[in-house]
Each structure stands twice: as structure tokens, then as C-alpha cells.
Amino acid sequence: MSGPRAGFYRQELNKTVWEVPQRLQGLRPVGSGAYGSVCSAYDARLRQKVAVKKLSRPFQSLIHARRTYRELRLLKHLKHENVIGLLDVFTPATSIEDFSEVYLVTTLMGADLNNIVKCQALSDEHVQFLVYQLLRGLKYIHSAGIIHRDLKPSNVAVNEDCELRILDFGLARQADEEMTGYVATRWYRAPEIMLNWMHYNQTVDIWSVGCIMAELLQGKALFPGNDYIDQLKRIMEVVGTPSPEVLAKISSEHARTYIQSLPPMPQKDLSSVFHGANPLAIDLLGRMLVLDSDQRVSAAEALAHAYFSQYHDPDDEPEAEPYDESVEAKERTLEEWKELTYQEVLSFKPLEPSQLPGTHEIEQ
């Protein structure tokens, strides 16, 4: 094995060799998942702490290669205060022949909503501010034509100033079969996506926001199902069994037959579920946790709800340029995905330190 690329150094972390530019110092592992492992580091060029994600086996298979390309393109496209932003992307490779590793550099966020819920009881003001930011980021993502599909507390990062960013969006499309075994994911998933009821739309993410908001208010998960059947039962105990109109929209005959076999359950009054909660919070939850996805509020509508009157500013809730999915919808070979990804890595222009939000011109 030859030495590291000029200007790079190697370090073994969690049984993985990392090869990174010398400006990234003090690498410390902070977590790992199915798609890669993450370290915190100090970026000497940006003069700030960052998160560095090393994608695991980015080109191991066609599915991996396509997902790698999609993740990089999504991160490059989305630029919003409440969505994780790409500060840099690099590879130790100097040619397409050697290209096998991809590293993504993003803003370092101290905690996620999972940590927050476990550590402290949140005031209603806290919940307002967090859910407002979550919906503000979601409005932006949805305006690009992207569906997150996997919103859950661990995918929502928060820093010490209570500023929130959405992580890991849009990746679950090809990865569904890998995620079915992962329990906590299911608790936040809209019934129509979990049970393949029908073609779903962006409001699957609104259901997830409802589940997250409920957890922030209660300090515990709203629908912690043990399996799909238990999950559905818990959901219907709160929102009631679907009306004939909703049943008619379910394209899966199997799902329809099963639901019709259940004893009818009425919709619960949410104020009996969330004792002492702000009535406006309960009203908003009632508009998000709706079985009929056509009746759920959109992110833009939810932002205008009276619960957020303290924060809502229609002139400061931006939308995105539409995201062109046609490139990744095409069938390509593994080598073609790799070549496209390599071009995306090379064409990325990192921000100068002076362009970062909240930073000033730094004298060199």
C-alpha cells in the first residue's frame, strides 16, 4: 500500500483507516450507522468544528453506488439553515481508477432530539421553537420535490442554542428493505408507507413530525409498536379506524381486508392523551396525525398555524430550487454511477470561511 496522498494523513479509527486532508485535526469517532461512520474534527481552514462522514463501501454494489451519488447530489442541492449543509466533500483518490472512498464534511451538531428527550422535560416554548424549525426545514425540502421518508428523533440534530437541522433525508428510497428490521424507525412512519397501502406523498413526513412533536410534549414515544400489527393497533387506538372513504383509497387488498376485520375504534380526544398541553399544540397535532394523507396539513400550512405565531414569518420561510431526480432515475452501470459521483466530488466548491453564516473575514 502506498503512502497517503500529498496533503493528507492516515489514522485508524474504529478498525477503519481514515485518510483525510491535514487541515482536519483531532478526529474523534461520534457514531456509525448502516451508511457510514462519523467523526468530529477541527477544520483549520474554516476554524470550526465539523462532522466528517466516511461512507461505508460507497461502490460495493449498484444500490450502494446509486445511493452514494444521490446523497452527495442532495447535500449539494439543499442549502437551508434547518437542513444539514455540505461544507466539503473529498476523496484521497487522485484518479477515477483509485476512487473508492467518499468523505462528506458537514456542520457539527452537538445532539439529536433523542438525546434531548431523554435528558430534560421540555417547556411548551421549547417545543414550539423546535417543531417550527423542523417544519421550516421540511417546507424547504418538500418545495424541492424531495420526500424525507425517514424522519425520526435521531435524524434531527440540535446544537446548544436549540438550533435544529434535519439529517439523512431522501436516502430511504432504495434502502427500505434494509430498514424493516429496525424498530425505532417504524414508530415514526406513516401507516401508508409502513404497510404499503398506496402510493404515498410528502405528507408521510408530516405524520412523522406529529409523532416527534408528541414525543417532545410527552417525553416518550407516541406509538412504540412491537411489530407492524401492534403499531397499527396503537395508531388506531388514538386516531380511530379508517372511514369507508379512507379505506377506499387503500390500494392493497390485503391491508383493506385486515383493517375491516378489526373492531371499530373511535377517534380519541387528543386532550385526554396530552394532559395539560397547550390547546394550540393539540389542535396542530390533530391536523398532522390524520390517517387520510390527503387531509393532513402541508409543512407550509402548519407553519402558519397559530401555535407558531411567535415565530412564523412568511418572508423568512424560503423554498428550494426544484431537484432534478431524472439523472438518478436512469438505469446505469456501477462504473457509470462511480464516474458521475467522481465528477460531483471534483466539481464541488467549498465555501470560503468568510461565506459561512455567522463568521467574519478571517485574516490569514
UniProtKB/Swiss-Prot annotation:
PROSITE patterns in UniProt: MAPK, PROTEIN_KINASE_ATP, PROTEIN_KINASE_DOM
Subcellular location: Cytoplasm; Nucleus
Motif (TXY): 180-182
Keyword Transferase: yes
Acidic residues composition bias: residue spans: 314-326
EC numbers, comma separated: 2.7.11.24
Regulation: Activated by phosphorylation on threonine and tyrosine by MAP2K3/MKK3, MAP2K4/MKK4 and MAP2K6/MKK6. MAP2K3/MKK3 and MAP2K6/MKK6 are both essential for the activation of MAPK11 induced by environmental stress. HDAC3 interacts directly and selectively with MAPK11 to repress ATF2 transcriptional activity, and regulate TNF gene expression in LPS-stimulated cells. Inhibited by SB203580 and pyridinyl-imidazole related compounds.
Cofactor(s) for this UniProt protein: Mg(2+)
Modification after translation: Dually phosphorylated on Thr-180 and Tyr-182 by MAP2K3/MKK3, MAP2K4/MKK4 and MAP2K6/MKK6, which activates the enzyme.
Residues bearing PTM Phosphotyrosine: 182, 323
Residue positions binding ATP: 30-38, 53
Catalytic machinery residues: 168
Keywords, ordered alphabetically: ATP-binding, Cytoplasm, Kinase, Nucleotide-binding, Nucleus, Phosphoprotein, Serine/threonine-protein kinase, Stress response, Transcription, Transcription regulation, Transferase
Phosphothreonine: modified positions: 180
Boundaries of every Protein kinase domain copy: 24-308
GO biological process: bone development; cardiac muscle cell proliferation; cellular response to interleukin-1; cellular response to UV-B; cellular response to virus; MAPK cascade; negative regulation of cardiac muscle cell proliferation; osteoblast differentiation
Reactions this protein catalyses: L-seryl-[protein] + ATP = O-phospho-L-seryl-[protein] + ADP + H(+); L-threonyl-[protein] + ATP = O-phospho-L-threonyl-[protein] + ADP + H(+)
One Gene Ontology term of the molecular function aspect: MAP kinase activity
Binding positions for nilotinib per the UniProt entry: 71
Annotated spans, Disordered: 312-331
Gene Ontology CC annotation, any one: nucleoplasm
Family: Belongs to the protein kinase superfamily. CMGC Ser/Thr protein kinase family. MAP kinase subfamily.
Function: Serine/threonine kinase which acts as an essential component of the MAP kinase signal transduction pathway. MAPK11 is one of the four p38 MAPKs which play an important role in the cascades of cellular responses evoked by extracellular stimuli such as pro-inflammatory cytokines or physical stress leading to direct activation of transcription factors. Accordingly, p38 MAPKs phosphorylate a broad range of proteins and it has been estimated that they may have approximately 200 to 300 substrates each. MAPK11 functions are mostly redundant with those of MAPK14.
Oligomer and partners: Interacts with HDAC3 and DUSP16.
Comment on protein domains: The TXY motif contains the threonine and tyrosine residues whose phosphorylation activates the MAP kinases.
Protein name per Swiss-Prot or TrEMBL: Mitogen-activated protein kinase 11
